């Protein structure tokens, strides 16, 4: 049978309701006939309408199981749009109409009978008309020769029934005479007792024999109906070319589905998308076309493949069904009109994160230990590494250890071992009594006691196909093989492993939870009960112990009433019910290639089913639709192709220019020079062309004149060059006619083709979000963005130079840290697979720098990145540049002048003078002088000024709370005096500060790493530098007392354990280092991004080259 699909009739045809209506009408009669056959009450209730329908419209006997069965088959066939059912119903309606017409013409009927016959005739004519109009909608075929086969079955059944009935009448004649017995049997079996009983002189046999005679006829009729309406079987499976095409699609897109390789199972049929870029494999069982897993191939072509598959189902009257679809596949099938229900979950192991340690893996760990103690080792090989003799032994083991007579599986099993086309499959063997081989592929000299075979999942995955173990294998053998496979995954190039499928996993899990409802518990109980035969719970638990990632799998169906039928088809397909003449596990059984003829004719496919020539397949399955690109991009791409066709290298190797643009403008006229940069403007005046060229130093005008160009013309320049292109030009400096200094170009070359247009040449990028996301474009067209990059670089250079001149050493300390400390902030968490260890991105380098101080590094600093998982606004970025510096034998007073000098030198480097740039109300930036000393205040003094009430370190907590309430400052009830003062400081002082000011002597309780004040109790030697509401830096007289340091960090660790995400953890290594004694030290921490922000007058996002942006 050729599986090419004719186009389906449009579903929105105005007569699309006819098949369903015909099926429902006949189905209602069949149902009522069946119920009336067993219920006298129903038979009495429907007697009047039944007799009317039976007399004038449709044969509707009061009791007939056979007729009800036949009508039910006819109704199903009509609903399935089978053409033979259409013919039967049409001919019946024509015959019934003719019968009514004949009765009307006789004129012997009563008025009531004539009215009934007129109504019946009208119904028949209407039915005939609608059936004729809807004829194209009945496209489904039945099996070839079904009509003749049904007639033969009916004739044979009737003949056997008559002969057997004749024999019964001879044995049990009753009062029936011998001469009547054969005729009586024929009347009861063949004519359904249509002959008047008076013809037999009132004689009749025993009632049981009489019933059996009628049953024989009914059985013959039912058998004929079954044969007549039976759906077409799929007699075509994979050919070599089909399998080769599928393997090619798996090479290109196999990473998407762990079950994709099972599409090469050879007892499946296949239907391809018209362009060959996707395919669906399936089997037909009990009239269900059962697809396995997701479509194979390009997800963009899945809809076309699904349409072709549904068209095929419609052509032959198959009910569509899908087993084992992923989320993406189920969505695609649902978009095509099917419904989806979750079957269960697939267990996925990620070797990078697989560990035997931890309480959750205790059962696996113990099982592995038992197996190893029993002398079991594991070896892993690709199938191609096995000799034919070794593979024969593997197949023998698989057959011997199988616990069923036949191989099971359909959607999640390959059904073969040892095929040369499957050379990339993995074989994992458990070997007992030997060394298991010194190398991974060494067979060793032991006895194989278990095996796993896994098929490829893309280029870096493996999906379990076969799992076998000897009855004599030690406990834990399977666990050992799975664990070793994960441990050696990197060596064999595997990053993901698909294990068994756990059906109804969520039901087992939810039904066992505390507080599960009665329905969930009952459903779980039923599954556990049936697991005695089907191992549902065993599969779930065998997978669950590995702590896998559960990936849902779905079954899809067209209509809810078809779920049982799809389920039966699945049971048959999976091998739980084996039918005669099954083609399971055979070699290529296909008679007709289903792959698109263009693909077959290309010659890239292989007749033996091996993978095709991939370069040819990529060409033959290329997307016919070009990518959707803006018009200007398409124009530039066309120019690029034209240049490449002419032999022009649009992206050549670099060659340094002799001058920058700025240097070229200042060069003498008679010096030949080279410049390179980006073209920003082009003005073409025919034979003369002007182009504005920009590099990092500035801009220079290019003048191209046809009379001076040594090669090409200005027309060649405009044909090849677009705004934004990178070019190099050679010539001498001169002047244009209007006196503009220009480079008189003699020849030029393209150094980089820009494929996307630049923004407006006058406005540039005006949207701030666009400037952040496309900083490279902003830098290319916006001189202000370049100035900010220069300013930032100048600030960093000035800070380093200032510290270098003071004798400081620059160091680098770890960014990945096991304990977050050095500041109170929420950290970012990451994980290192090599040590299976959670790590933090550092929030500050302080604790490591202090270790260096303990070691004798007296002046040290680090200028690097820190990370804090906090908010994002004009002054905060999760990733930022932080300066921390420590000077031995100094205190926090030393750093007041040191910090001011650093910032003033940075301002000089960026702005040329000691100024910050501040925006006015109209947005224009104006300089603000920051030279000279800066104001210094204590925290309590500043808060007192803001409150208008005096407070100090001795002010009690109730008084502070009362003042906070009066000022509208929120606080938490568990805060101490220091925390309340700090909250008032942040709201009343820090936010309102303008000129740079040092606020010193903070409460001790909010300064855990700072030494207590030398003369004032309750405060610590710490200052914060604030300017225009932004904290720029902080400095401490560092706490060097290791005992006090331990006490404070222990208090912080208690807060962290209590759920405070910003509290520091206890760093025992740091505390141990401090016990070796650190000299009296003054430490400085400064946010460089904020300093740049105030120096340039911009937000922090503008001053960072690439700030973190919210995903689109």
From Swiss-Prot:
Cofactors demanded by this protein: Mg(2+)
Membrane topology per record: Multi-pass membrane protein
Record-annotated DNA-binding residue ranges: 675-748
Pfam family, one: tRNA-synt_2_TM
Highest taxon of the lineage: Bacteria
GO molecular function: ATP binding; DNA binding; lysine-tRNA ligase activity; magnesium ion binding; phosphatidylglycerol lysyltransferase activity; tRNA binding
InterPro entries (UniProt xref): Aa-tRNA-synt_II, aa-tRNA-synth_II, aa-tRNA-synth_II/BPL/LPL, LPG_synthase_C, Lys-tRNA-ligase_II, Lys-tRNA-ligase_II_N, Lys-tRNA-synth_II_C, NA-bd_OB-fold
Cofactor: binding details: Binds 3 Mg(2+) ions per subunit.
EC number: 6.1.1.6, 2.3.2.3
Role: Catalyzes the production of L-lysyl-tRNA(Lys)transfer and the transfer of a lysyl group from L-lysyl-tRNA(Lys) to membrane-bound phosphatidylglycerol (PG), which produces lysylphosphatidylglycerol (LPG), one of the components of the bacterial membrane with a positive net charge. LPG synthesis contributes to the resistance to cationic antimicrobial peptides (CAMPs) and likely protects M.tuberculosis against the CAMPs produced by competiting microorganisms (bacteriocins).
Similarity field: In the N-terminal section; belongs to the LPG synthetase family.
Protein name in the entry: Lysylphosphatidylglycerol biosynthesis bifunctional protein LysX
């Amino acid at each position: 049978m050729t599986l090419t699909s004719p186009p389906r009739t449009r579903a929105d045809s105005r007569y699309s309701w006819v098949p369903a209506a015909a099926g429902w009408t006949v189905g209602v009669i069949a149902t009522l006939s069946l119920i009336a056959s067993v219920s006298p009450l129903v038979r009495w209730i429907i007697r009047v309408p039944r007799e009317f329908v039976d007399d004038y419209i449709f044969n509707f006997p009061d009791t007939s199981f056979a007729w009800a069965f036949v009508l039910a088959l006819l109704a199903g066939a009509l609903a399935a749009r089978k053409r033979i059912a259409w013919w039967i119903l049409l001919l019946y309606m024509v015959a019934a109409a003719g019968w009514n017409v004949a009765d009307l013409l006789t004129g012997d009927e009563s008025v009531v009978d004539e009215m009934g016959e007129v109504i019946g005739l009208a119904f028949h004519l209407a039915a005939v008309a609608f059936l004729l109009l809807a004829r194209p909608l009945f496209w489904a075929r039945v099996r070839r020769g079904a009509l003749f086969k049904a007639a033969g079955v009916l004739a044979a059944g009737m003949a056997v029934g008559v002969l057997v009935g004749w024999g019964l009448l001879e044995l049990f004649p009753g009062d029936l005479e011998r001469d009547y017995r054969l005729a009586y049997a024929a009347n009861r079996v063949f004519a359904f007792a249509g002959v008047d009983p008076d013809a037999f002189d009132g004689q009749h046999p025993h009632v049981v024999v009489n019933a059996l005679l009628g049953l024989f006829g009914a059985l013959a009729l039912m058998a004929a109906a079954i044969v007549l309406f039976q759906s077409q079987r799929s007699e075509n499976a994979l050919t070599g070319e089909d399998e080769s095409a599928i393997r090619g699609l798996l090479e290109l897109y196999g990473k998407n589905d762990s079950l994709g390789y099972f599409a090469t199972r050879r007892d499946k049929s296949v239907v391809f998308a018209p362009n060959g870029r996707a395919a669906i494999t399936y089997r037909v069982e009990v009239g269900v076309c059962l697809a396995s897993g997701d479509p194979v191939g390009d997800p963009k072509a899945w809809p076309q493949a699904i349409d072709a598959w549904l068209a095929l189902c419609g052509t032959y009257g198959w009910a569509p069904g899908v087993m084992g679809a992923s989320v993406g596949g189920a969505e695609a099938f649902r978009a095509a009109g099917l419904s989806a229900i979750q079957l269960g979950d697939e267990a996925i192991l990620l070797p990078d994160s697989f560990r035997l340690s931890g309480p959750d893996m205790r059962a696996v760990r113990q099982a592995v230990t038992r197996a190893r103690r029993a002398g079991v080792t594991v070896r892993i090989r690709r199938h191609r590494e096995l000799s034919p003799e070794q593979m024969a032994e593997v197949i023998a083991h698989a057959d011997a250890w199988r616990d069923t007579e036949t191989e099971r599986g359909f959607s999640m099993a390959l059904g073969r071992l040892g095929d040369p086309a499957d050379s990339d499959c993995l074989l994992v063997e458990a070997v007992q009594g030997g060394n298991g081989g010194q190398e991974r592929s060494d067979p060793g000299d032991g006895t194989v006691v278990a095996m796993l075979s896994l098929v490829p999942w893309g280029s870096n995955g493996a999906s379990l196909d076969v799992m076998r173990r000897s009855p004599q294998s030690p406990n834990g053998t399977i666990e050992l093989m799975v664990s070793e496979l994960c441990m050696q995954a990197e060596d064999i190039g595997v990053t993901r492993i698909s294990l068994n499928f756990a059906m109804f996993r969520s039901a087992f899990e939810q039904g066992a939870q505390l507080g599960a409802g009665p329905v969930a518990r009952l459903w779980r109980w039923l599954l556990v009960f049936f697991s005695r035969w089907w191992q549902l719970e065993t599969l779930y638990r065998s997978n669950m112990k590995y702590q896998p990632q559960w990936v849902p799998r779905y079954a899809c169906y067209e209509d809810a009433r078809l779920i049982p039928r799809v389920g039966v088809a699945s049971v048959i397909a999976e091998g739980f019910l084996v039918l005669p003449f099954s083609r399971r596990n055979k070699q290529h059984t296909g008679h007709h290639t289903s792959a698109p003829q263009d693909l077959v004719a290309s010659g890239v496919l292989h007749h033996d089913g091996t993978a095709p020539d991939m370069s040819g397949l990529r060409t033959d399955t290329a997307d016919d639709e070009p990518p959707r690109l803006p018009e200007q991009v398409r124009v530039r791409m066309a120019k690029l192709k034209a240049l490449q066709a002419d032999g022009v290298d649009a992206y050549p190797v670099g060659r340094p220019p002799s001058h920058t643009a700025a240097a070229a403008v200042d060069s003498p006229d008679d010096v030949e020079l080279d410049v390179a940069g980006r073209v920003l403007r082009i003005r073409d005046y025919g034979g003369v062309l002007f182009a504005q060229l920009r590099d990092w130093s500035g801009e220079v005008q290019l003048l191209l004149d046809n009379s001076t160009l040594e090669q090409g013309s200005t027309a060649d320049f405009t044909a090849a060059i677009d705004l934004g292109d990178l070019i190099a030009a050679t010539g001498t400096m001169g002047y244009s006619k209007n006196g503009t200094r220009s480079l008189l170009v003699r020849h030029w070359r393209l150094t980089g083709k820009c494929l996307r247009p630049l923004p407006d040449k006058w406005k540039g990028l005006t949207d701030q979000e666009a400037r952040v996301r496309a900083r490279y474009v902003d830098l290319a067209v916006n001189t202000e963005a370049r100035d900010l990059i220069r300013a930032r670089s100048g600030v960093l250079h000035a800070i380093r130079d200032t510290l270098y001149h003071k004798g400081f050493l620059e160091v680098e300390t770890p960014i990945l840290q096991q304990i977050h400390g050095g500041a109170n902030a929420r950290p970012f968490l990451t994980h290192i697979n090599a040590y299976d260890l959670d790590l933090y991105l550092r929030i500050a380098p302080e604790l490591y720098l202090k270790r260096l101080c303990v070691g004798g590094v007296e002046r040290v600093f680090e200028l690097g990145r820190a990370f804090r998982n906090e908010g994002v606004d004009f002054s905060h970025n999760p990733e930022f540049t932080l300066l921390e510096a420590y000077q031995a034998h100094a205190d926090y007073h030393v750093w007041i002048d040191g910090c001011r000098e650093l910032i003033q030198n940075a301002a000089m480097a960026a702005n040329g003078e000691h100024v910050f740039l501040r925006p006015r109300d109209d947005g224009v930036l104006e300089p603000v002088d920051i030279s000279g000393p800066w104001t210094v205040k204590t925290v309590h003094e500043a808060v007192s000024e803001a409150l208008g009430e005096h407070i100090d370190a001795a002010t009690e907590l109730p008084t502070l709370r009362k003042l906070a309430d009066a000022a509208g400052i929120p606080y938490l009830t568990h805060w101490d005096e220091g925390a309340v003062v700090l909250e008032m400081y942040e709201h009343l002082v820090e936010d309102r500060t303008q000129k740079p000011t040092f606020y010193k002597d903070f409460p001790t309780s909010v300064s855990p790493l700072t030494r207590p004040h030398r003369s004032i109790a309750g405060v610590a030697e710490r200052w914060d530098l604030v300017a225009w509401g932004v904290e720029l830096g902080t400095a401490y007289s560092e706490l060097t007392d290791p005992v006090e340091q331990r006490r404070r960090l222990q208090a912080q660790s208690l807060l962290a354990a209590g759920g405070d995400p910003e509290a520091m953890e206890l760093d025992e290594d740091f505390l141990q280092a401090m016990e070796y004694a650190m000299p009296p030290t003054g430490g400085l921490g400064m946010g460089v991004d904020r300093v740049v922000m105030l120096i340039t007058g911009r937000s922090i996002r503008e001053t960072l080259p690439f700030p973190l942006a919210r995903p689109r």
